[in-house]
């Protein structure tokens, strides 16, 4: 059995609450909770839903669990929903609206999270949407809440959460589409802006936009050089959806794919370009970016190039030195640096 996280331990010490015929677990983590939940409910239908492809791949190895990784939770008439509180408040509010469109009228909603995640705001966030709320338990710096007699939504349409914004860099202007939970939600960040200003001017070929967010990098390069073809990868189904919308809106030739790091990426590229992520959930996590840098070379053509932007304090140059014959620092200030192989 996998080690249990503190939110999962809190859930399991209230195992009498974890009973249902059709159970939905949203934003689950990579631990042993789903196994334990199946043991408690051997005859029940259990669906594990995540926006995160890596979590979905983890859960696929658990017997008796239906796994869904998507940008939208599908209808299921669930009578018990267990929600792990996410790091993004806009993502939470969108997920709650989605949940209220897929549950039965008798459903109970359990919400668990670490204190530092902001979970203590959940009662206010569900005000006027449930008749009963109860703080069931708190321990290990976590809190567990229960909600019942929930006001249902007749439908859920993710397009109502689209947020469009303008990007204008180096005489290239376009409209981007984002949704809650996506990096670049609502605007162009300073690091990506610097990357675009210093991106190589490749005229044709295949480009991988790694950790694509809302698809800003691919769209910028595609509008600058329309002969390019893009593969845009992200671990987030929300990001893949947003990127698809942005590419389509701007008639850029590319596709969005779900991948845990480079695991699902096939073929070789003339350019790999990225503002690599260094957070997992609410925690700092360098493993994804470091694994990406250690393995990017095998996905490049013989003359292919890697270009990234990173916070200046991150220790990426030693990895670049080890993996490539040479690399250049294209631009650097006290906040960011652009590196190219």
Predicted regions and their residues:
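Short amphipathic alpha-helix with an adjacent loop that forms part of the alpha/beta core around
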Residues: 70-76, 263-267
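N-terminal auxiliary segments of SAM/dcSAM-dependent transferases
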Residues: 91-169
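Conserved SAM/SAH cofactor-binding pocket of Class I
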Residues: 2-63, 188-274
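Conserved Class I SAM-dependent methyltransferase catalytic core
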Residues: 109-131, 135-138, 283-341
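Short SAM/SAH-binding signature in class I
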Residues: 78-84, 269-277, 307
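Short loop/edge segments at beta-strand edges and connector loops
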Residues: 69-71, 257-260, 310
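Active-site beta-alpha loop architecture of Rossmann-like, nucleotide-cofactor-dependent enzymes
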Residues: 88, 279
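SAM-dependent Rossmann-like transferase core, predominantly class I methyltransferases
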Residues: 4, 140-206
């Amino acid at each position: 059995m996998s080690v249990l996280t503190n939110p999962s331990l809190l859930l399991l010490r209230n195992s009498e609450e974890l009973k249902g015929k059709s159970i939905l677990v949203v934003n689950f983590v990579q631990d042993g909770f789903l196994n334990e939940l199946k043991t408690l409910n051997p005859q029940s239908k259990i669906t594990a839903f995540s926006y995160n492809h890596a979590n979905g791949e983890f859960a696929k190895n658990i017997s008796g669990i239906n796994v869904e990784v998507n940008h939208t939770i599908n209808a299921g008439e669930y009578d018990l929903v267990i929600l792990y509180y996410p790091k993004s408040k806009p993502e939470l509010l969108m997920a709650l609206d989605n949940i209220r469109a897929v549950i039965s009228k008798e459903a109970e909603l359990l919400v668990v999270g670490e204190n530092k995640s902001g979970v203590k705001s959940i009662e206010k966030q569900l005000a006027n949407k449930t008749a009963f709320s109860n703080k069931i338990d708190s321990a290990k710096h976590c809190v567990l809440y229960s909600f019942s007699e929930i006001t249902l939504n007749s439908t859920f349409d993710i397009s109502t959460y689209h947020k469009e914004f303008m990007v204008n860099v180096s005489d290239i202007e376009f409209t981007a589409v984002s949704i809650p939970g996506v990096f670049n939600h609502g605007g162009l960040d300073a690091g990506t802006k610097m990357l675009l200003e210093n991106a190589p001017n490749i005229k044709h070929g295949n480009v991988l936009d790694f950790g694509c967010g809302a698809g800003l990098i691919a769209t910028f390069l595609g509008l600058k050089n329309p002969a390019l073809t893009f593969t845009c990868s992200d671990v987030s189904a929300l990001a893949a959806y947003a990127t698809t919308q942005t590419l389509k809106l701007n008639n850029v030739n590319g596709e969005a794919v779900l991948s845990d790091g480079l695991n699902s990426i096939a073929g070789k590229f003339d350019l790999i370009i990225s503002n690599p992520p260094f957070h997992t959930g609410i925690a700092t996590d360098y493993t994804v970016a470091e694994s990406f840098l250690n393995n990017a070379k095998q996905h490049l053509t013989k003359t292919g190039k890697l270009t990234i932007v990173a916070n200046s304090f991150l220790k990426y140059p030693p990895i670049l030195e080890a993996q490539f014959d040479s690399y250049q620092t294209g631009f650097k200030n006290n906040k960011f640096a652009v590196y190219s192989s």
